Amino acid sequence: FVHERHAHNKDLNRFTGWWSHNKKTRFKMRGEFDQLSGAEGWQLSNPPILSMAAIKASLDMFQDVGIENLIKKSRKLTGYFEFLLKQLGEDTIKIITPSNPDERGCQLSIQVKNANKTLHDKLTAAGVISDWREPDVIRCAPTPLYNSFEDVYRLVEKLKKILKASP
């Protein structure tokens, strides 16, 4: 991503490469850099082939599964996660992510009453991958490509166990 206020400023220091050179003069080898304007002027060179092989494999997975299928599963997984969290009661957990699936992705941000980063650390120790945001938000994102409904269930069970053991 290159912000538009920087995209056309050719005086800014940057890494430059083959792909940021003007296509019309690129092969003339004049010894001077003829930078493209806009975000294209920030491109580097060809990516390493081994890195691209891994990216190709991951893109193949997305194509095999299908984006529409991922979206459907994502909505169901996140809806299930939301349902399970609401069973804990809003006096314990507040979901601050919009409830409308059209206004969110797979991530739910939650606030847990009287919790701090210790709760996040305990979830991490229990094998849950989540994200902590000050002052009191834990973000969890059941990802449809590799998370299951059982994963979501186990996450909430671990959360309940940690909350029950907390003073």
Language-model features, listed with the residues they occupy:
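Active-site C-terminal subdomain of aminotransferase-like
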Residues: 1-69, 73, 79
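Short, flexible turn/loop "capping" segments at secondary-structure junctions
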Residues: 35, 51, 100-102, 132-136
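Short, solvent-exposed beta-strand edge segments and adjacent coil->beta transition regions
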Residues: 39, 103-107, 135-139
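Non-transmembrane alpha-helical segments in soluble domains
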Residues: 56-59, 82, 120, 156
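Short alpha-helical functional segments enriched in proximate histidine and acidic residues
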Residues: 61, 84, 162
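Conserved PLP-binding catalytic core of the aspartate aminotransferase-like
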Residues: 75-126
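PLP-dependent enzyme catalytic core of the Aspartate aminotransferase-like
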Residues: 114-167
